[in-house]
């Protein structure tokens, strides 16, 4: 048999073992697991994975649409910067929309206030050696730093996102 490259081989037994571990954690803690489509958007195994996961999270409109249409469950959307068109589309199907800044939240709040909304928080440290994704680097604009400004937004939010472990083995 001739296989044309590139191709991906997925060991379903190993994948299933990891999914079963997640299921145990879900049952014992009440935690939810969402698939980060930026890291793994191989829809060939979505039928298996959706049995063990609660939905997807995405970093673009098209990833969010993929998760909504092909995976199901909860659809979480996050992007460093949204266009008005992206927000309008996401308002139609995303369950949770996470903003990178308070100014984004202010700009789009009226259109999405019926959704679960969140803000990305800059923790001020990072475990990553990848400078572009390091929220603690100088002049970083990855998330909200001002604790007082964040406190003023609490009534509009249903959650926070901490993202500090990108590109870390």
Residue ranges and their predicted role:
Residues 3, 21, 25, 93, ...:
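Short, flexible coil/linker segments at or flanking structured domains
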């Amino acid at each position: 048999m001739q296989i044309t490259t590139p191709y991906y081989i997925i060991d379903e037994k190993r994948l299933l073992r990891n999914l079963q571990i997640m299921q145990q954690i879900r049952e014992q803690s009440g935690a939810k697991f969402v698939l980060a489509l930026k890291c793994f958007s191989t829809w060939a195994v979505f039928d298996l994975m959706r049995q063990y996961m609660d939905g997807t999270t995405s970093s673009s409109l098209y990833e969010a649409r993929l998760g909504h249409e092909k995976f199901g469950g909860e659809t979480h959307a996050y992007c460093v910067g949204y266009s008005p068109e992206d927000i309008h589309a996401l308002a139609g199907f995303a369950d949770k929309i996470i903003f990178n800044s308070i100014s984004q939240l202010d700009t789009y709040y009226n259109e999405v206030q019926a959704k679960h909304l969140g803000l990305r928080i800059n923790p001020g440290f990072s475990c990553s050696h990848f400078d572009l994704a390091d929220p603690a680097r100088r002049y970083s604009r990855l998330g909200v730093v001002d604790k007082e400004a964040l406190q003023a937004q609490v009534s509009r939010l249903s959650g926070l996102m901490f993202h500090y472990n990108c590109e870390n083995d």
